């Protein structure tokens, strides 16, 4: 002890190399009071030489002596180099980062040495790590041995530093393992190569003890990711499909052992993934449906968009496949949350993160959910306080309301404020957030309201004068009919609904629209705009009853949420809504209804006020609809949560979508004051059919009705029309919705609504802007519906979805939408374009399309399925549960309801189709094909009767009186000679039938696979079309002989005319010596055949040389016949052999643009122009071009086949006119046939010269 007190100064002349870096007791301890740092300053060297003596090591704190060898073994040998804290530039090691070892020196916590600690790492370290007994036993020694001296290297300047080390340093580093920890993302396939990738979320490097237990690990993981439910890890070099789950201590031990092996090999670290319960379910769904929506999911995940899938009664469903919407940021996480937060917490401007502590920034709160939030918790009511607007009470009568997350930048604390009758909440920036949100152990289905729930807002204090215009606009006065106001009170006296009945009735009373009193102040911050519903008001001041620029939009979109009923009880069996003894009106304001999907038992309450303003005082701004188009694109949510067989939705009310269950979600959750870019409107059309009142009780599957996307023109005719029952087929380019609605009163006259079948005058077209309508002019002609199948010019109007698979059109439309061709445009006179908001875009460059469509269709070269594909439930059921066939265009008559509604929309994923209703008075439709119509009517009526009787469908179809003209051929009468080819549609054989050469097409059973109702419907379609084909007789149309129904295994087959030389494509490739005259004859025959088909109202849609059959037996007169034009209902399910790539070059721009689902027969004329080029050159168009380039070039009219120099001027002119971008310019087939006949006649008198060239493949 004396030596320790004397501090002898001894110089070591020959220190042991092993001892370098350790030092001895011969160092002076001093305390630097100025810096509060414990330093160890070595005394100067006096050059004293002494004999070798043992090294004595003492503890500075206790003075106890201990063995040097023991200390050497316990101290880490590799110090870290850090800058000299005193500024001296010595290269010696001076300090060890204790925080990296999980330890802190007790004497240096507050000094500069504390800067070595990684504060962030310290904060994120695990505080509950298990302490083994050995570590506790070593505690005394750990306190004793806190430091060791350091000896400099040979180049040491003499300054030496004491290093703070721990006796447990080496043990701590060896007992911990580093992992990459990822959470919050998704494992989904990359669209380009379908390889699994983890995208989105966060990734951190964590360090855990190798001896940690599984329970402790889970606890620590939940500190990082509170929603963690499953832990999986990925070994280096393994793919994401080889993740290993950790669910027990044994699994954890195996993981640690694997990590030790890979950790010693290099810097590559094993990766750990934390998954929540929803992540697992979502990943499984994405994998099952990766083909249809992987790109959208990938883009969402990569960009961190908050677009979580939601549950429906049929399973998880992606909220939307409109990639363009995503790319335009409509579903950006922060923006999306803003749609739900303002109603709850975002009421005052807040700077930075001052609104809430960090611990509260992701606290779930009750609010209006767009369906994208991951949690839902119940509340019954809340009162919102808006600056300058007073209180607005929001009631939710029911079980659950969705909950969104508050963003730290847009939030305010909330507190409870008692109110009578309900459990209200008041937004108050002085109360903590937790007091508002009740916590429940079980969360409901994500993003949806529970049953028996409604939203409404009351504005008791706002006066009607606040509804004055805030902006300068020109106005037009409306008619003098009385207009009543809706008291925006969705509360119901009897909010409960029973599943047994939901029977809304609508009759007797007129409907009108008027403004609301609530106007959001202009000075209210855009992101703080409250989400409220329309408010009640007394009789407005006639001088102040004006509609704001943005108000008409909301009344269009949200009247469905503003109706209240005296008897709101609903039954599931009957789905009509009762609106008796009241006048219903639409309220317009700058407030909005929460976009919630009211589920099956949501009451449709209709509480109507009796105040009636002076109608002459109501003025509508011209630009109100323009604002509607500009603003409603901000948050276009989708509600896939509707359950099967639900029908609580109204039809358009004066151009407004009135929905009992809130499924009309065309931007209905938009925050009106958000300045968001205009979302590309979805392609959405209407086919309106007056229905018999007895048929309005049909149930439906509803997911995403966009009925209110229809724009109502300002009317100058009567505002009140008789109320009638109707049905509407809703068409949408990329989201399915099929919803049969009950009837509702209609405000506008027939000339005030643009119908999909209606036609517009030229003056109307001029008044409709191609991008976003500035205003909607009053209509000048009555917009009566065009007869089904024809427009006013006599052209054939058909549905493209009737002939093309849904995925095929989905891919095309997806590409098209990415090209920024928004929704709908005005209807052309020939029905070629039906649109409300089509944008006139400048042609894009080649590089744009190339980048856009890169790998877009790489894996699409296969048969694709249509919306009516078996297994995809499109048929509905009536009240008796009998499947109803909705395969053909509706047939209308005044007193006979159609039992068929045509599927008009492109379906995607598992979303069910939506058939909505609308009342269109004076709707006259004339069927275009008598035989076709009769067969449909008979088939539909007798189908139901047969199903009820339990008779097999095929037997019934064959025996149907309307199909007696169809020949049923016995399979035993056929003799198969040779297989000609096979594809997804089936196999074609050359055979004999009663001594005649025939082509036998055996249809694969897969074309009819699915549920029994789907098989029945598809089989019904097959028989109907076969019966139509059997009635076609023309020398240039392939003859249809009959149908075989008793083929091998019960398969169906068709027997048609056999053409010796096969397809024209085969002939052009093999026979290079067709002279000009023969080519003209072949083209002329094809034109004759198409003229005949069009005269029978049949559009081919797939006209190309592969589908033109030729017979060259007579060298003087070749024969060409049009084939493969029938059985579209079956054929479209397979899209013939060759898939997508074999169809694109012949498709007209209107088919690819997606601006309309209604096209004319001129699409065949476009295809015929490409056929003329094929006949001329013998080559395939665009053989080496990418799919996306073909689509972009055709749509933008920058791509057509190159016409060779040897082409005759007449041929060239005819070709170019046929493939003209404007359908009006294209000639009809009678004109084409006449010109080809003239050219052929002139060719007889001239020597063939030009076309005898050598054709190159």
Curated annotation (Swiss-Prot):
For the modification Phosphoserine, which residues carry it?
474, 555, 777, 1013
Summarize what gene deletion causes: Plants lacking RAF-like kinases exhibit growth and developmental phenotypes such as defects in plant height, rosette area, root growth and germination. Reduced root sensitivity to auxin-mediated growth inhibition and slightly delayed gravitropic response in response to auxin associated with a drastic reduction of auxin-triggered hyperphosphorylated proteins, but no obvious defect in auxin-induced genes transcription. Insensitivity to the promoting effect of auxin on cytoplasmic streaming in root epidermal cells.
What Gene Ontology cellular component terms go with this record?
A: cytoplasm
Q: Which post-translational modifications are recorded for this protein?
A: Hyperphosphorylated in response to auxin in an ABP1- and TMK1-dependent manner.
What controls how active this protein is? Activated by auxin via rapid phosphorylation downstream of ABP1 and TMK1 signaling.
Source species of the chain: Arabidopsis thaliana (Mouse-ear cress)
Could you tell me what this protein is called?
RAF-like serine/threonine-protein kinase 24
DNA repair listed as a keyword:
no
- Bias (Basic and acidic residues) ranges: 457-480, 493-502, 550-576
The organism's place on the tree of life at top rank: Eukaryota
Q: Where is this region: Disordered?
A: 1-21, 457-629, 761-789
Q: Where does ATP bind?
A: 980-988, 1001
The Protein kinase domain is annotated at 974-1239
């Amino acid at each position: 002890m004396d030596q320790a007190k004397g501090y002898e100064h001894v110089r070591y002349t020959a220190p042991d190399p092993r001892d370098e870096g350790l030092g001895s007791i011969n160092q002076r301890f001093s305390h630097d009071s100025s810096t509060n740092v414990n330093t160890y300053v070595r005394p100067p060297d006096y050059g004293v030489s002494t004999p070798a003596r043992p090294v004595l090591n003492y503890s500075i704190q206790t003075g106890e002596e201990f063995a040097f060898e023991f200390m050497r073994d316990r101290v880490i040998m590799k110090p870290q180099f850090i800058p000299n804290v005193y500024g001296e530039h010595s290269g010696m090691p001076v300090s060890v980062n204790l925080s990296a070892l999980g330890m802190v020196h007790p004497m240096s916590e507050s000094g500069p040495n504390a800067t070595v600690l990684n504060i962030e790492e310290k904060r994120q370290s695990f505080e509950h790590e298990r302490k083994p007994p050995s570590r506790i036993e070593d505690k005394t020694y750990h306190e004793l041995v806190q430091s060791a001296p350091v000896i400099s290297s040979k180049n040491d300047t003499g300054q030496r530093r004491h290093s703070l080390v721990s006796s447990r340093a080496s043990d701590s580093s060896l007992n911990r393992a580093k992992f990459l920890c990822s959470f919050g993302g998704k494992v989904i396939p990359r669209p380009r190569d379908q390889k699994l990738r983890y995208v989105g979320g966060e990734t951190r490097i964590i360090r855990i003890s190798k001896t940690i237990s599984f329970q402790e690990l889970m606890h620590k993981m939940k500190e990082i990711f509170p929603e963690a439910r499953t832990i999986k890890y990925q070994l280096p070099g393994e793919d994401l499909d080889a993740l290993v789950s950790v669910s027990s201590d044994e699994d954890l031990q195996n993981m640690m052992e694997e990590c030790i092996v890979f950790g010693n090999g290099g810097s590559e670290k094993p990766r750990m993934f934390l998954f929540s319960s929803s992540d697992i379910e979502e990943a499984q769904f994405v994998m099952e449906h990766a083909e249809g929506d992987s790109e959208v999911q990938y883009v969402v995940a990569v960009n961190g968009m908050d677009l979580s899938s939601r549950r429906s009664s049929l399973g998880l469903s992606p909220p939307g496949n409109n990639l363009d919407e995503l790319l335009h940021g409509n579903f950006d996480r922060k923006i999306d949350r803003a749609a739900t937060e303002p109603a709850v917490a975002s009421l005052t401007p807040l700077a930075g993160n001052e609104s809430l502590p960090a611990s509260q920034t992701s606290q779930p709160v009750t609010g209006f959910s767009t369906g994208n939030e991951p949690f839902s918790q119940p509340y019954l009511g809340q009162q919102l306080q808006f600056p300058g607007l007073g209180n607005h009470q929001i009631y939710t009568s029911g079980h659950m309301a969705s909950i969104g997350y508050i963003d730290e930048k847009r939030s305010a604390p909330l507190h409870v404020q008692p109110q009578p009758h309900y459990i209200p909440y008041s937004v108050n920036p002085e109360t903590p957030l937790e007091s508002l949100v009740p916590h429940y152990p079980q969360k409901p289905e994500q993003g949806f309201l529970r049953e028996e729930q409604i939203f409404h807002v009351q504005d008791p204090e706002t006066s009607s004068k606040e509804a004055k215009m805030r902006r300068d606009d020109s106005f037009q006065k409306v008619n003098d009919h009385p207009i009543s106001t809706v008291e925006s009170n969705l509360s119901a006296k009897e909010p409960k609904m029973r599943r047994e009945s939901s029977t809304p009735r609508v009759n007797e009373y007129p409907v009108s629209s008027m403004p609301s009193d609530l106007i959001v102040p202009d000075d209210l911050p855009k992101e703080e705009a409250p989400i409220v519903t329309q408010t009640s008001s007394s009789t407005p001041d006639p001088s102040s009853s004006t509609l704001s620029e943005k108000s008409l939009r909301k009344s269009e979109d949200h009247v469905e949420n503003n109706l209240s009923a005296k008897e709101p009880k609903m039954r599931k069996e009957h789905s009509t809504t009762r609106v008796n003894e009241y006048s219903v009106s639409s309220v317009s304001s700058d407030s909005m209804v929460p976009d919630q999907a009211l589920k099956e038992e949501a009451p449709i309450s209709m509480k109507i006020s009796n105040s009636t303003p002076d109608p002459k005082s109501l003025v509508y701004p011209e630009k109100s609809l323009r604002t509607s188009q500009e603003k409603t694109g901000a948050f276009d949510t989708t509600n896939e949560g509707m359950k099967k067989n639900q029908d609580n939705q109204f039809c358009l009310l004066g151009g407004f979508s009135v929905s009992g269950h809130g499924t009309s979600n065309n931007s209905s959750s938009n925050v009106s004051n958000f300045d968001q870019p205009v979302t590309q409107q979805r392609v959405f059309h209407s086919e309106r059919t007056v229905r018999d009142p007895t048929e309005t009780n049909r149930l439906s599957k509803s997911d995403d009705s966009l009925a209110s996307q229809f724009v109502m023109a300002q009317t100058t005719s009567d505002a009140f029309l008789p109320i009638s029952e109707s049905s509407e087929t809703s068409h949408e380019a990329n989201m399915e919705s099929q919803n049969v609605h009950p009837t509702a009163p209609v405000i506008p006259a027939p000339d005030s609504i643009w119908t999909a079948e209606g036609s517009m005058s030229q003056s109307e077209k001029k008044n409709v802007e191609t991008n976003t309508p500035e205003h909607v002019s009053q209509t000048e002609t009555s917009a009566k519906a065009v007869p089904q199948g024809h427009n006013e010019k006599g052209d054939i109007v058909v549905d493209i979805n009737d002939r093309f698979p849904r995925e095929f059109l989905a891919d095309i439309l997806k590409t098209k939408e990415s090209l920024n061709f928004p929704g709908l445009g005005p209807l052309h006179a020939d029905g070629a374009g039906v649109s409300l908001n089509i944008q006139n875009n400048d042609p894009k460059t080649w590089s744009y399309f190339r980048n856009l469509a890169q790998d877009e269709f790489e894996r699409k070269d296969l048969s694709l399925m249509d919306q009516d594909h078996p297994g995809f439930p499109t048929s509905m059921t009536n009240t008796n549960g009998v499947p109803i066939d909705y395969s053909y265009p509706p047939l209308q008559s005044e007193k006979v309801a159609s039992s068929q509604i045509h599927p008009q929309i492109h379906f995607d994923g598992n979303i069910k189709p939506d058939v909505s209703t609308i009342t269109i008075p004076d709707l006259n439709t004339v069927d275009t094909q008598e035989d076709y119509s009769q067969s449909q009517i008979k088939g539909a009526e007798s189908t139901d009767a047969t199903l009820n009787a339990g008779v097999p469908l095929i037997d019934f179809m064959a025996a149907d009186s309307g199909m007696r003209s169809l020949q049923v051929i016995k399979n035993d009468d056929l003799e198969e000679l040779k297989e000609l080819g096979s594809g997804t549609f089936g196999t074609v054989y050359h055979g004999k039938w009663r001594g005649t050469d025939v082509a036998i097409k055996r249809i694969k059973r897969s074309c009819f696979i699915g549920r029994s109702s789907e098989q029945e419907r598809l089989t019904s379609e097959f028989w109907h079309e076969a019966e139509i084909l059997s009635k076609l007789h023309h020398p240039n149309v392939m003859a249809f002989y009959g149908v075989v129904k008793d083929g091998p295994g019960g398969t169906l087959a068709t027997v048609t005319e056999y053409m010796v030389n096969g397809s024209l494509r085969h002939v052009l490739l093999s026979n290079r010596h067709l002279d000009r005259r023969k080519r003209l004859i072949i083209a002329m025959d094809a034109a004759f055949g198409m003229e005949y088909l069009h005269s029978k109202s049949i559009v081919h849609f797939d006209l190309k040389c592969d589908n033109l059959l030729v017979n060259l037996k007579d060298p003087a007169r070749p024969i060409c016949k049009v084939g493969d034009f029938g059985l579209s209902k079956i054929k479209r399910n397979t899209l013939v052999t060759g898939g997508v790539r074999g169809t694109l070059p012949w498709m007209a721009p209107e088919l690819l643009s997606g601006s309309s689902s209604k096209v004319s027969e001129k699409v065949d004329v476009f295809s015929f122009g490409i056929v003329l080029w094929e006949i001329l050159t013998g080559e395939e168009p665009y053989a080496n071009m990418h799919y996306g380039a073909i689509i972009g070039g055709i749509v933008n009219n920058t791509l057509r086949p190159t016409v060779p120099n040897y082409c005759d001027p007449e041929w060239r002119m005819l070709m170019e006119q046929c493939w003209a971008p404007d359908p009006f310019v294209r000639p009809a087939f009678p004109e084409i046939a006449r010109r080809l006949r003239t050219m052929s006649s002139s060719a007889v008198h001239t020597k063939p010269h030009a076309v005898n060239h050598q054709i190159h493949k």
